[in-house]
Amino acid sequence: MANYFNTLNLREQLDQLGRCRFMDRSEFATEADYLKGKKVVIVGCGAQGLNQGLNMRDSGLDVAYALRQAAIDEQRQSYKNAKENGFEVGSYETLIPQADLVVNLTPDKQHTNVVETVMPLMKEGAALGYSHGFNVVEEGMQIRKDLTVVMVAPKCPGTEVREEYKRGFGVPTLIAVHPENDPKGEGWDIAKAWAAATGGHRAGCLESSFVAEVKSDLMGEQTILCGMLQAGSIVCYEKMVAEGIDPGYAGKLLQYGWETITEALKFGGITHMMDRLSNPAKIKAFELSEELKDLMRPLYNKHMDDIISGHFSSTMMADWANDDANLLGWRAETGETAFENYPSTDVEISEQEYFDNGILMVAMVRAGVELAFEAMTASGIIDESAYYESLHELPLIANTIARKRLYEMNVVISDTAEYGNYLFANVATPLLREKFMPSVGTDVIGKGLGETSNQVDNATLIAVNETIRNHPVEYIGEELRGYMTDMKRIAVGG
């Protein structure tokens, strides 16, 4: 199979990369009706599979789970997940031929095998659904021409898909139809009904493409969403402990600090996050973030280039063929880092203290979001896609670190995201350790500036504020957050 994106000419590539339109709520007036009375069969019952299925059932759809016979016979976790929640469970051979929509929610590395197995069993004119387009775009899966191929990609982990639905809300969702597979012209009707059944239409849906979803998703998760948080956690912890800060305090400041700092980002963008700092601290964070952007821009651009060219996906698929040797080795190394093993502490840290003593963390967030956004948009990805795959998802990933450190983040994200995270962090960590961290002190990470006066130069502060507020990510962010008026707040510090 050939990489689908690389078979397109330049005009087609740019057209697909630039697809992203915020859909009006009126476009979902019929909600999930198009799929009512039809059979939805989900393959895979992990976090996305189970939680999307629960939402779809609660929205009035007929949902069942098709699992491999071995998973049923051995009563594996996927079987238990489905059975304990009262779903019909059967083998591929039993359920797939009945399905009007087969939703493939297995891990990326299983997609080729799963699709090649279920496709001969699917009835004429049925639909095949994905929540990530890697198999179609990067592996170039050829799908039977009578089948409609759609994507509904919630922009958060599966557990959040369920929790937001139960609140009567949803999570922002990208939807797409594969242009090579829409024989009856019903792809958008199916995708919209599926998205509405998960609750996504209540938070906002973006009409996208398989290409735009894959390329932006890979870039976001490798850099700011996971790689930057991992590298930042490791080097900031090392710095604080080396400078005599209590390891328990240092670890807690980072573990819960990312979540607290990005919570401000969620509600008011980079502008509001920076406004949570005192004026002297804001100027310091701005200066640090400018240094970080200069240092790390080549690394961000390399990741974007490797994603666009297909080099990243071919490298990762080679590791799949080698039994995930690199992935598993890097996972073990992460578990051995000092931050992952810091001693627990009862020390209390107030919400504002996370900002005051985490100035460098704020700088890393600003630098990382802006660099990821800039690399994506410079490559033809439209602002809306770049926003969702950088700034918007960051608080959701930071929340996983607050639960169980980097381990939890890497468990919750996909293996594809985890592999890309390590690729980035393995370069970013020594880069920061050698080229940046020696020049910073505990005034920006661990202790705070301790200023007795809030006095700053007026012209400097005005210039800093102007630069922060006039970045393109702030303009599109303000527009898109306007559609998400019911975002929930976190409980600070776990």
UniProtKB/Swiss-Prot annotation:
**Residues engaged in binding Mg(2+) 2:** 217, 389, 393
- Catalysed reaction equations from the record: (2R)-2,3-dihydroxy-3-methylbutanoate + NADP(+) = (2S)-2-acetolactate + NADPH + H(+); (2R,3R)-2,3-dihydroxy-3-methylpentanoate + NADP(+) = (S)-2-ethyl-2-hydroxy-3-oxobutanoate + NADPH + H(+)
Question: So, what pathway does this thing act in?
Answer: Amino-acid biosynthesis; L-isoleucine biosynthesis; L-isoleucine from 2-oxobutanoate: step 2/4; Amino-acid biosynthesis; L-valine biosynthesis; L-valine from pyruvate: step 2/4
What's the EC number here? 1.1.1.86
Cite the active-site annotation: 132
Sorted UniProt keywords: Amino-acid biosynthesis, Branched-chain amino acid biosynthesis, Magnesium, Metal-binding, NADP, Oxidoreductase, Repeat
Give GO MF terms, alphabetically.
ketol-acid reductoisomerase activity; magnesium ion binding
Keyword Amino-acid biosynthesis among record annotations: yes
One GO biological process term is: isoleucine biosynthetic process
Please give the PROSITE patterns that the UniProt record associates with this protein. Answer: KARI_C, KARI_N
- Could you tell me what the cofactor note in this record states? Binds 2 magnesium ions per subunit.
Give the required cofactors.
Answer: Mg(2+)
Task: List residues binding Mg(2+) 1.
Answer: 217, 221
Tell me which residues make up the KARI C-terminal knotted domain: 209-344, 345-487
Q: Indicate the segments forming the KARI N-terminal Rossmann domain, all copies.
A: 14-208
List the Gene3D superfamilies: N-(1-d-carboxylethyl)-l-norvaline Dehydrogenase, domain 2 (1.10.1040.10), NAD(P)-binding Rossmann-like Domain (3.40.50.720)
Annotated positions binding NADP(+): 45-48, 68, 76, 78, 108-110, 158
Record flagged with keyword Magnesium: yes
What residues bind substrate, as annotated?
414
Q: Name one Pfam family in it.
A: KARI_C
Provide the Gene Ontology terms for cellular component: cytosol
**Family stated for the protein in its record:** Belongs to the ketol-acid reductoisomerase family.
- What's this protein's function? Involved in the biosynthesis of branched-chain amino acids (BCAA). Catalyzes an alkyl-migration followed by a ketol-acid reduction of (S)-2-acetolactate (S2AL) to yield (R)-2,3-dihydroxy-isovalerate. In the isomerase reaction, S2AL is rearranged via a Mg-dependent methyl migration to produce 3-hydroxy-3-methyl-2-ketobutyrate (HMKB). In the reductase reaction, this 2-ketoacid undergoes a metal-dependent reduction by NADPH to yield (R)-2,3-dihydroxy-isovalerate.
- Would you tell me the protein name for this molecule? Ketol-acid reductoisomerase (NADP(+))
Encoding gene, per UniProt annotation: ilvC
